[in-house]
Curated annotation (Swiss-Prot):
Subcellular location: Nucleus; Chromosome
Quaternary structure note: Interacts with TRIM24, PTPN13 and DVL1. Identified in a complex with SMARCA4/BRG1, SMARCC1/BAF155, SMARCE1/BAF57, DPF2/BAF45D and ARID2, subunits of the SWI/SNF-B (PBAF) chromatin remodeling complex. Interacts with IRF2 and HNRPUL1. Interacts (via N-terminus) with TP53. Interacts (via C-terminus) with EP300. Interacts with BRCA1. Interacts (via bromo domain) with histone H3 (via N-terminus) acetylated at 'Lys-14' (H3K14ac). Has low affinity for histone H3 acetylated at 'Lys-9' (H3K9ac).
Pfam family, one: Bromodomain
Name the UniProt record assigns to this protein: Bromodomain-containing protein 7
InterPro entries per UniProt: Bromodomain, Bromodomain-like_sf, Bromodomain_contain_prot, DUF3512
Function text: Acts both as coactivator and as corepressor. May play a role in chromatin remodeling. Activator of the Wnt signaling pathway in a DVL1-dependent manner by negatively regulating the GSK3B phosphotransferase activity. Induces dephosphorylation of GSK3B at 'Tyr-216'. Down-regulates TRIM24-mediated activation of transcriptional activation by AR. Transcriptional corepressor that down-regulates the expression of target genes. Binds to target promoters, leading to increased histone H3 acetylation at 'Lys-9' (H3K9ac). Binds to the ESR1 promoter. Recruits BRCA1 and POU2F1 to the ESR1 promoter.
């Protein structure tokens, strides 16, 4: 066997010296948790220590072999001492390695600062803002996030300006967008979810009004409105109240507000508020219960209880007000003859248009109900009817004959470029009708010679004389002779009228017989038109004012017809607004009617029945027949206009 070579002393710790110890990093993220990361893998560290242990075991085996070979050496105590020394040396080496590793970890560990990082600061500020928000604001923000998810293109995120959409401010008077709604939520301008719902509807309807139905903005607004109404429906809001904590808090805060209001208005408000709080606690307990049916039943019971208590409170308040009035206020019985027909549930009514009577079909003042009165504004489509346009295939276009003048024998005689019938059919049409139907007067002799001199006219007259055997010239002579006689007759009539007007004296200086003659003369000069006679100057002024108002109304109607009959531009869906002339005429009519109404009593303008009908008061039929006067019936004979002179007191 060959001789074993001993390892050199420098080779014993070669692996331990050149293998670098792994670096460890200590990271602190947010809280107090510490994670350790090492540059070397854990397997590498374990392999390092395993190699050391194997190396020590290998030494022990060698020592055992040596001991077996040194059995002849006497003295077991010496062997024990050697073993103890070696074991102590091993322990010291291990302690030294562990101390060096701890020092390396301390050198590589980062310095931990006491200042918190930036992210926890921002998160804490956001939490503070969330804590400061009311439950209603949190609920509205939650709904806004759901609504904005339905607008992926962000069409409604920011306000629309006239630079983006021309004429937007003229058409849309109340703009709305998501950013404005968020600002309102931040400023706590919304008092309920219904106000947010109304603004959302306004935003979608504005986009549908300004844009045409075929645009992407119109379709996006319609889709957003459909999905948003589902999000803002009562069922979805109730489910949110059961699933989200701050929605339940929103319900509690509403009840607390209602309780404080009722406590301030009534005498026993404290008990009522405690009852409200108990009901709120019961409802919160019901919301926590797992069964949905029990929740609905509890909510229904609480609502019924709240309504009944509210009715009792209102009844007590009414009784107390009636007692405090000292007999001025009394309870009206239900079976009274007068009542409001258009009364709303909240007690309000509407004022209708003043009209004296209700005409029947066939009467002169009857106004039939039209479709525009019963239907509202068009939600989609255009505001004008489609104009009629004849199809080009239905129009017959014959060939066009050409004339180049002299020396054009070999030129083409007709042009069939735009013709849709053959030449034979065109000749048949020309032979039947003589000329083109669109231009019937182009071949007229007089229009053809309109710009010519006298000589062509003489030639044309002679040609017509030949055709009519002299009848054309005789007709021209008769026409020339009749014209001077008519002119002389009209001149004599004008001079006679001027003489009569200058010779007549003013009507104030004439007696009754001369006034009758003057009236008869006026009737003659007005060609038989009856002249209206006034009893006083005030009546004449009043009638002139009425005539002026009638003229203004006609002008206003003409201006409106002109505006509404014009075709609007294709980029506008809405109708054009009233012009300045229409506004001015309407203001003049209003002022004239106001002046006329100030000069008469209210009974001359409208009847008692008309006022009561406008207020919605129903009156029994016999009383109604005796109280109103029909102001719309036409008279057979012309009446003289009478003006009621009223004093300053209106009597």
């Amino acid at each position: 066997m060959g001789k074993k070579h001993k390892k050199h002393k420098s080779d014993k710790h070669l692996y331990e010296e050149y293998v670098e110890k792994p670096l460890k990093l200590v990271l602190k993220v947010g809280g107090n948790e510490v994670t350790e990361l090492s540059t070397g893998s854990s397997g590498h560290d374990s392999s390092l220590f395993e190699d050391k242990n194997d190396h020590d075991k290998h030494k022990d085996r060698k020592r055992k072999k040596r001991k077996k070979g040194e059995k002849q050496i006497p003295g077991e105590e010496k062997g024990r001492k050697r073993r103890r020394v070696k074991e102590d040396k091993k322990k010291r080496d291990r302690d030294r390695v562990e101390n060096e590793a701890e020092k390396d970890l301390q050198c590589h560990a980062p310095v931990r600062l006491d200042l918190p990082p930036e992210k926890p600061l921002t998160s804490s500020l956001a939490k503070q803002e969330e804590v400061e928000q009311t439950p209603l604001q949190e609920a509205l923000n939650q709904l806004m996030r759901q609504l904005q998810r339905k607008d992926p293109s962000a069409f409604f995120s920011f306000p629309v300006t006239d630079f983006i959409a021309p004429g937007y401010s003229m058409i849309i008077k109340h703009p709305m967008d998501f950013s404005t709604m968020k600002e309102k939520i931040k400023n706590n301008d919304y008092q309920s979810i219904e106000e947010l719902k109304d603004n959302f509807k306004l935003m979608c309807t504005n986009a549908m009004i300004y844009n045409k139905p075929e645009t992407i903005y119109y379709k996006a607004a319609k889709k957003l409105l459909h999905s948003g109404m589902k999000i803002l429906s009562q069922e979805r809001i109730q489910s949110l109240k059961q699933s989200i904590d701050f929605m339940a808090d929103l319900q509690k805060t509403r009840k607390q507000k209602d309780g404080t209001d009722t406590s301030q208005s009534g005498e026993d408000g404290g008990c009522w508020q405690r009852e409200r709080e108990d009901s709120g606690d019961a409802e919160a307990h019901a919301s926590k219960s797992p069964s949905k049916e029990n929740k609905k039943k509890d909510n229904d019971m609480l609502e019924d209880k709240f309504k009944s208590n509210n009715l009792e409170r209102e009844q007590e308040q009414l009784d107390r007000i009636v007692k405090e009035s000292g007999g001025k206020l009394t309870r009206r019985l239900v079976n009274s003859q007068c009542e409001f027909e258009r009364r709303k549930p909240d007690g309000t009514t509407t004022l209708g248009l003043l009209h004296p009577v209700d005409p029947i079909v066939g009467e002169p003042g009857y106004c039939p109900v039209r479709l525009g009165m019963t239907t509202g504004r068009l939600q989609s489509g255009v505001n004008t009817l489609q104009g009629f346009k004849e199809d080009k295939r239905n129009k017959v276009t014959p060939v066009l004959y050409l004339n180049y003048g002299p020396y054009s024998s070999y030129a083409p005689h007709y042009d069939s470029t735009f013709a849709n019938i053959s030449k034979d059919d065109s000749d048949l049409i020309y032979s039947t009708y003589g000329e083109d139907s669109d231009l019937p007067s182009d071949f007229s002799i007089h229009e053809f010679l309109a710009t010519c001199q006298d000589y062509p006219y003489v030639m044309a007259d002679s040609l017509l004389d030949v055709l009519t055997k002299g009848g054309h010239s005789r007709t021209l002579q008769e026409m020339e002779m009749s014209l001077p006689e008519d002119e002389g007759h009209t001149r004599t009539l004008d001079t006679a009228k001027e003489m009569e007007i200058t010779e007549v004296e003013p009507p104030g200086r004439l007696d009754s017989s001369t006034q009758d003659r003057l009236i008869a003369l006026k009737a003659v000069t007005n060609f038989g038109v009856p002249v209206e006679v006034f009893d006083s100057e005030e009546a004449e002024i009043f009638q002139k004012k009425l005539d002026e108002t009638t003229r203004l109304l006609r002008e206003l109607q003409e201006a409106q017809n002109e505006r509404l009959s014009t075709r609007p531009p294709p980029n506008m869906i809405c109708l054009l607004g009233p012009s300045y002339r229409e506004m001015h005429l309407a203001e003049q009519v209003t002022n004239n009617l106001k002046e006329l109404a100030q000069q008469v009593t209210p009974g001359d303008i409208v009847s008692t029945y008309g006022v009561r009908k406008a207020m919605g008061i129903s009156i029994p039929s016999p009383v109604m027949e005796n109280n109103f006067v029909d102001l719309t019936e036409d008279t057979e004979e012309p009446k003289k206009t009478d003006v009621a002179e009223c004093g300053p007191g209106g009597s």
